[in-house]
Amino acid sequence: MNTKTFIKKYTMVIALGVVFILFAVLTQGRLLYPQNLSNLLLQNAYVLVMACGMLLCILTGGNIDLSVGSTVCLVGAIAAQLLANTGLHPVFVILICLLLSIVIGIWQGFWIGNVHIPPFICTLAGMFLFRGLGRAILGSKTVSIANKTFLNIFASYINVPGLDDQVKWSAFIVGIVISALLIANTFRARAQKAKKGYKQSAAASEFAKIAVIDALILFYTWKLAHYKGIPVMALWVVAVCLIYAFITSKTAFGRYFYAVGGNEKATKLSGINTEKVYFMAYTSMSLLAGLSGLLMAARIGSVNGDTGNSFEMDAIGSCFIGGASAYGGSGTVPGIIVGAILLGVINQGMSIIGLDNNWQYVVKGAVLLVAVIFDVVSNKKTGKAG
């Protein structure tokens, strides 16, 4: 792999590294404090979760879901009211909220997939509808969540008695195990390719990449070990990302989303039910928006009528910044993870240095514009635009 190809392939990873170093310097190292690195995950958990669902929508042809922020508000409002005013066990409350999220997705998926209402219009209507319902349920008030079981399911930390004291060694041990598994998986994958006679990249470059990833994992888990340990919220985020990475890269159904975005007419002629693809994309998106609503409600400890405002923009921005094409048909879960982290680092870095909130919007808008321009220019060069 020559330098030009390397830079093109890892543009956003390089950008993430540069931005992280820049803010580490501008904040005089405060960005690297264990608490700030832990908050980086907690404050962007909802973005990572929703971005996985948004990716499926974007893959179908650059479509988006504008209603997810309002879905977060509606689901959070119902969870808060059920926990505050009924004797339902938190697990039942969670199941009710996730079921409601699926119903919302089925509602939107039907209109988009079967009736062929443009996704932008349908989800714009949903944005107003679900926001209004959420505010009506809350009665224009802020409802607090004090149920410890609910909070522990989403917003607690993993601590092992007898092992974790001032330093949460379990967090660093998890980092070591993950790093070892990545190395073992790399050896296994290369051995399988060699056995089948497949062409593969140079061993030095592949193991250098794994070494960098492992170093980052060990650094991050070491920092977590010196704060409160691994947040339970991280388990939810990792689970969602792994599931969607598997669906989009290892299953035939996952490839249908790419096919629809690449050429919908050809996909339909090949026998694939494109209506079902749209239906599943928006049902999946609403389910993850509902989960994000529960995560956000637990982290903040309360819900109000403005909960979830602009969340859809963060999810959409993460996808485009992470390499998802504005035309659809391309994008990966690892890419959107990089995009979400990059956006999170920018947000947290600007907050730490005390940049005015108005200028924070300017910076985020500029970053998104640059990412989309890069995508459009790249597609024109390869003849994919239009």
Q: What are the roles of these predicted feature ranges?
A:
Residues 186-200, 242-282:
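Membrane-helix/interface signature in polytopic inner-membrane proteins
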Residues 23-25, 30-86, 110-117, 266, ...:
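Single transmembrane alpha-helix segments in multi-pass membrane proteins
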Residues 87-128, 338, 343:
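Alpha-helical transmembrane segments within multi-pass membrane transporters and channels
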Residues 29-39, 221-234, 245-249, 254, ...:
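Inter-helical junctions in multi-pass inner-membrane proteins, predominant
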Residues 282-295, 299-362:
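Transmembrane alpha-helical segments in multi-pass inner-membrane proteins
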Residues 43, 119, 148, 165-175, ...:
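Loop-to-transmembrane alpha-helix initiation sites
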Residues 130-248, 383-386:
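Transmembrane helix-bundle core of multi-pass membrane transporters
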Residues 1-21, 142, 179-211, 273-276, ...:
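Cytosolic-side transmembrane-helix boundaries in multi-pass membrane proteins
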